[in-house]
Amino acid sequence: MFQYIIFAARFPDKNTIFARFFHDFSESDNRLIMIRKEYIHNDIFEFEAGGSVEGLKVVYHCSERPWQEADERKVIWICHALTANSDAEDWWPELVGPGKLFDTEKYFVVCANMLGSAYGSSGPSSTDPKTGKPYYFDFPKITVRDIVRANSLVRKHLGIDKIDFMVGGSIGGFQSVEWSIMEPEVIKRAVYIACGVRVTPWLTAYNESMRMALETDPTFRECASLKGGENGLRCARSIALISYRSYEGYNATQWEKDEDCMFADRAGSYQRYQGKKLSDRFDAYSYYYLCGSVDSNNVGRGRGGVEKALGTIRTECTVVGIDSDRLFPVEEQRFIASCIPGATYHEITSKFGHDGFLLENDQLTAIIEPLLP
């Protein structure tokens, strides 16, 4: 019912910001890294909102030494955020890898790429076998529950009955909470970072603003190539970035160097740079779909409400908030912790807003390290 393909791991150029991280262990051929694989589900995959796909693909990365029955290693599963990928060593380099907090030698570490992503898992940028062209808007709408179900297919394919530790930040946190409810006996311990359990009007407003930005690009609806909507994507990313960061963070990094300049531009050029940076590695159609999946987040839907759904979680949970997070204010994480039996709450101090979950590595390590199996 499945097949998989193994790819060699890639090493960034030595001049990248991750060069030191890779250099630390690349001198020894015996050190283990995460490798890229693909899971192909040959049955029909039915989507929650309707529609189906045959041959659903989920790209994932895992520790190089394969998981085996009766393996003594503990399983750590990482759920990534909106535009990240399954190569957690790439976007969380201080925490994932040999000798790091999530040690890919000591543990069997897995990270699956979300459905709808531009990094290989099935989504609007995938090729429709009926047309030989990308699906674009013919791909079914994706919910958080669809993403979790697809990830669970990978878990079953790997032969993993229990996930000893799960961690996710932002939309990765959505997945972690939802998974704890959908498969309550599977996840032993989890850390939910900077996330919510029901999409707020505030968050939906941001998502709609980004969709509007994409739709203003006339090439977006033409569906002529995956470069369609590129300028709209840059604008959407600029909008998103404001929600990810904070007033204090911008003030700490984006003041003009010339106090006498007539027209401030440093922060503006930074927004344009970040917009182009995303459009160089992502596509507008995947972004559009993933924003839609965020709007589906509601753990209480069909379960009697959010509080009742959270009350069914049997996973040992730690919830982490960030004091400067404007996208998911700490009130949301405190609420989550108050509804889950036995959950604990921690708060990170950061000037970087929501993105603090990617940057405040020392504080995260202090919280997570004592919880690891």
Model-derived regions: residue spans:
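Conserved hydrolase catalytic core segment
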Residues: 163-201
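Catalytic active-site module of serine/aspartate enzymes centered on a nucleophile-bearing elbow/loop
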Residues: 343-373
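Alpha/beta-hydrolase-fold enzymes
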Residues: 186-188, 192-277
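Short alpha-helix in the alpha/beta-hydrolase fold that links the catalytic acid
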Residues: 303-306, 329-338
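N-terminal cap/lid subdomain of alpha/beta-hydrolase-fold enzymes
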Residues: 61-129
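Conserved acidic catalytic loop of the alpha/beta-hydrolase fold
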Residues: 134, 138, 145-164
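Short beta-strand/loop motif that positions the catalytic acidic residue
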Residues: 313, 319-321
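Catalytic-loop region of hydrolases
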Residues: 33-75
